């Protein structure tokens, strides 16, 4: 099974490569702190932007790298502590870029600086930062919120994953076998397993664990949300506005979507009832809501077979895809193993400074699990295509990234449906 190998990136937190990258980042942020306050003409602004690009790329890459380390084993605290330190540096970076962009936003279009300065590589990030909800906050308030994020939000997020990692669920299969599952395996089972007994016993075990630790979970979620709500209050901003900004979607678009959903609730309910009847029940059990369609026989798709199918579909889109996806696996950029303490779910993490697309998931061999891989490889391919762009142009809104992944999964569905030997 494909597994992450960090030797091609920073190795470990104690490696010379990682220490060198951190030293370079700290030196750049120090230089930047002296440049930004005095950047008032095209030459000094250009120099400041050059250092901003370096800091942007390195902070994003190192934070992403530590996220990957933490996800492999959420019980390991070294990477979690390092993420806190890096977020403190990132908060300083954001204060500096906000200060500079505030100055640029105040310039008239006729100002000679715009004619003298090559700003083309920064227009995208400038538009994103200047429309962010926190852009209107005072420097002092902004600094306070970022300090709170570094000291509260990041540790709480790691605490949440650590709490999940302590779960060892005892579950049963439809064959009567008893097995033990980690939290990540439990989540994967509910989303992808064809075994109804396994889904039911997994849900029961998860529910018991959540009930036993309800106070801890509630406390963590309250801490995660609390300081953000206070920040939105400072900015006189509706709490949904940051989500709209992050996904580059308007409130009007979301309202239109929800109106369409409400108008078609009867169809959604009918689909759930129909699915329940297909399983031989009159109502849909909660542990079956994300389950794949029941089959006459349980199937297991080896990872190699799943990847071959994904590459075959991808080749229709671009002939380079098969060899590129093989490269991702060979380089150790894909992680799909079932491990104790592993973070649940799946995510894609691009390491900008190294052009490394990192795929994280837990593969169980089901069709739904293969579909999840297609989504992740879609994200990775999208990242790979942009590797020649400046780092500051590659942080696209989350909604656009999701489109790239789900488009790839749709290609997989259509291909399998077209070549299926039967309706099943």
Where on the chain are the PLM-derived regions?
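Hydrophobic (often cysteine-bearing) scaffold residues that line and stabilize catalytic clefts
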Residues: 202, 206, 213, 257, ...
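A short secondary-structure junction motif
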Residues: 224-227, 231, 271, 275, ...
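Post-HEXXH active-site segment of zinc metalloproteases
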Residues: 371-372, 383-407
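Active-site hotspot residues in diverse enzymes, especially metal/ion-binding acidic/histidine motifs
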Residues: 242, 278, 287-288, 305-312, ...
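Inter-helical turn/loop segments and adjacent helix faces that build the functional surface
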Residues: 251, 317-320, 384-392, 414-424
């Amino acid at each position: 099974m494909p597994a992450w190998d960090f030797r091609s990136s920073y190795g470990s937190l104690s490696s010379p490569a990682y220490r060198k990258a951190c030293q370079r980042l700290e030196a750049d942020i120090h230089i930047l702190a002296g440049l930004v306050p005095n950047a008032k003409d095209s030459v000094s602004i250009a120099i400041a932007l050059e250092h901003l690009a370096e800091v942007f790329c390195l902070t994003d890459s190192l934070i992403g790298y530590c996220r990957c380390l933490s996800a492999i084993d959420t019980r390991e605290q070294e990477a979690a502590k390092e993420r806190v330190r890096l977020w403190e540096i990132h908060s300083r970076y954001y204060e500096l870029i906000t200060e500079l962009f505030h100055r640029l936003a105040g310039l008239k279009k006729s100002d000679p600086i715009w004619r003298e300065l090559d700003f083309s590589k920064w227009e995208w990030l400038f538009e994103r930062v200047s429309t962010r909800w926190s852009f209107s906050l005072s420097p002092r308030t902004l600094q306070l919120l970022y300090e709170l994020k570094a000291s509260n939000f990041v540790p709480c997020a790691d605490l949440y994953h650590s709490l999940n990692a302590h779960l060892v669920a005892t579950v049963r299969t439809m064959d009567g076998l008893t097995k033990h599952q980690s939290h990540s395996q439990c989540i994967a089972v509910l989303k992808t397993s064809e075994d109804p007994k396994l889904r039911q016993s997994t849900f029961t075990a998860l529910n018991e664990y959540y009930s036993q630790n309800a106070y801890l979970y509630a406390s963590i979620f309250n801490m995660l949300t609390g300081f953000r709500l206070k920040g939105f209050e400072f900015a006189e901003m509706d709490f949904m506005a940051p989500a709209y900004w992050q996904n580059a979607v308007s409130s009007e678009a979301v309202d239109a979507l929800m109106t369409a959903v409400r108008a078609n609730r009867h169809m959604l309910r009918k689909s759930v009832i129909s699915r329940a009847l297909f399983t031989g029940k009159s109502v849909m059990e909660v542990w079956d809501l994300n389950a794949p369609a029941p089959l006459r026989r349980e199937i297991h798709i080896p990872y190699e077979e799943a990847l071959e199918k994904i590459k075959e579909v991808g080749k229709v889109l671009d002939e380079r895809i098969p060899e590129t996806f093989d490269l991702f696996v060979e380089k150790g950029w894909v992680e799909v193993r079932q491990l104790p303490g592993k973070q649940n779910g799946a995510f894609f993490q691009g390491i900008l400074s190294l052009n490394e697309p990192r795929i994280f998931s837990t593969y169980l061999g089901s069709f739904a699990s293969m579909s999840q891989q297609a989504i992740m490889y879609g994200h990775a391919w999208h990242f790979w295509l942009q590797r020649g762009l400046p780092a500051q142009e590659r942080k696209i809104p989350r909604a656009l990234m999701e489109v790239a992944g789900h488009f790839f999964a749709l290609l997989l569905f259509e291909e399998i449906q077209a070549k299926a030997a039967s309706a099943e």
